[in-house]
Amino acid sequence: MTDPLAAYQLAKRRGMDFIALTDSDSLDGYAQLAQFADVIPACETTLQFPEDGCPVRVMVYGLNDAQLAKMLSLRGNLYNVREYLLAENLYHVVAQPLEPHDGKLSPDHVERLLLLFDHFEARSCGRQQRSNEFTSAFLDALTPEYFDQIQRKLKITPASERPWQKGQIGSSNDYCGQYIGLTWTEAPRVATAGEFLQQLRMRKGTPAGMHGSTIASAHSMYRVGAQLYASKVLRREGDVQGILELILTRLLSPEKPTKMQVAGSLWDALKNLFKMRKKPSAIERKLIAETIRAYRELPKDERLGGIDRDDLQTFDARLYNMADRVLSKVSYQLLNDAMKDFERGQIGSGLPLVAALLPIQSVMAPYLYSFDKLNRDRKLIRELSARVEGTLELPKKSARKKVAWFSDTVTDVNGVSMTLHRMSEVAEKLDADLEIICSVAESRAPTGSKFLNFPPVGEISIPDYELQKLSVPPILRIVKYLESQNFDEYIISTPGPVGLIAMFAAKLFGVPVRAIYHSDFPQHVRQITGDEGLEKTTWKFMRWFYGLADAVYSPSDHYRKQLIDHGFNPRRLFIYTRGTDLDFYNPRHRDEEFYKPHGITDRVIFVYTGRVSREKNLDVVVDAFLQDEVLQRKAALAIVGDGPFRDELIARKLPPMIVFPGFVKGKQLAKAYASGDVFVFPSTTDTYGNSVLEAQASGLPSLVSNEGGPKEIILPGESGLVLPGYDVNAWRQAMRSLVESDDLRHRMAAAARARAATRDWSTAFREFWDEDPYPKADEEVRAIVIA
């Protein structure tokens, strides 16, 4: 795509003494510059291993047209090409030696390449710093002993007498005309291009200059689009995708980006739009408006104007952030408007908005493709490192495990949030290398040192969960961060937007995943909607999402069995044991005055804490209370918490011994537990039930349903009772028995505290952090394949 003369002039302006244009299978670029003595004839071609067709790219220098033609005639057999290049004494280099172009490249192929070739591209502007540095370190680590070993194994004659001493070069790997001369090869000062090549043959070249990045790779694609646009090839239809592509490609034109160019690009898009339509659609108007708004909201030092034309790294980073804002904001607005239409029953209005999300997301394709392309070598690098371990001295990776934990909920009143905060506190004390990644409004962001919040583009209300919001995270920003951090493991607590991004990144970067099945979403959906079809659809999503994980953790054996019944692989299912703060939740926090402001004195107090919502089955406990005269005379029921079902219960005008203290936290929550006498938790959908464990630690016997995970927290008949979830009479009788027998209540209270004492957070964290479930899961996969 790049004009040879323009490429030559740019390289000279950037300080290059000699220049080689490595066109694919052609010397046409060189032919147009042959009059310049500092230009080296060169080309790049793709060779193949004849045994399996695995492709390998090779750059050849100093050749003529006849030699090129002969080489191309042999390229189906890499071995024959190698022999021809040696016979013709042509300087040649393996390009991007660890890039698995079609997924076939393996450590076996790399060992063959090491024997066959003496020169390798160790720094490429088309590869990331991580890849380049490993390539260089690997080549530097080669030894005679290693070559003896692989030569005996492969029976290949090395290219030279000292094959462990490899020549290394750097190259721009540019195909859009922007990165020329930013990566190069240095050699001792010489007078002619021929002498320079001779220095490289003698392995005296040193790669230098910038490394590539996924952002630069994506923008290269857009820059090619800019050149197509300038050539009138870019399609001209007036739709959302075309408009945004037009804006991006205009911003990525080869000229120096200025404030006027940014404004001009947006204006060109508007003019193009009005030429194509008499009246632009609402979506197109929104796209342009959001683009302009996003740019105006950028701080001045983050805008595109005023950047030196050679400072492409700064420009690329700023444009990436801008594209992230634009795409995220427009997507959020469309999704939010669609949700509002659906809530109003206007399905016909909402569906086109949802459909419009697809072309907008496709504009991200160059970014997503680049994330994939530039990270495909991670698996090969891991395999190669494992193969030479103990043979070659490569830079040691830190033995300290680095983990990213993802959750869509971190500050809400639920077990997931509470668990994450407790785990983060233990991680701080133990100095574990853990980051908990979330996306919530900055006003609600957690402040702990282990939390990393990416402010969302917006938030969407969840039906029947007015107190909770579904965040729309900045996808590109999160993925770029994850790429840069090289985490050893991902842990995913929720299958929401943040969890989906984490799973996507895990597949891109080859990171193992542990996913925790915290919430029984299918049953929640059925209870909220009454629609069994939606419940089945939710199960399909759960199987798909958790099926992508390497290991899945269930909070209880009950839910492990349920997941198996719904098609989950039993060998990939593990139990996730949580803990509690035994000092914080403690009987000593009992305060006889705590419930007095609510009119409760001298009664046996039944306590519920948590979210007050329909799926918690609280009406069973309320009805049981209302149907028993002894309970109304001697007991009280305190429903502590907030939620959409609270107002419905209050509206029933319940008797005064049923009270609603509202939402409490911190020390007040500890007192709310300890100041009660019995804990009730009738939910049939909770996968675990943190509040049950907290109540047990506070010295309260617990009444729980026979469905869900909480029944596994108590010792039935000792620290509490397990009751049929929807049997009001069974709950009434159990509650009455505890009111009428102080001895039974006190005995169960002591057993509850003793039961909880075995489950502190430090133990729970260490067990989970140190567990390695992957060998077991991999073993099962191998067993299935063999069988």
Residue ranges and their predicted role:
Residues M1-T2, D65-T185, H211:
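Domain-core and long-helix interface of multi-subunit machines
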Residues V664, K671-G676:
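Short alpha-helical donor nucleotide-sugar binding micro-motif in glycosyltransferases
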Residues T684:
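Aromatic "clamp/platform" in nucleotide-sugar-dependent glycosyltransferases that forms part
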Residues P701-V704:
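Short hydrophobic beta-strand element within catalytic cores of glycosyltransferases
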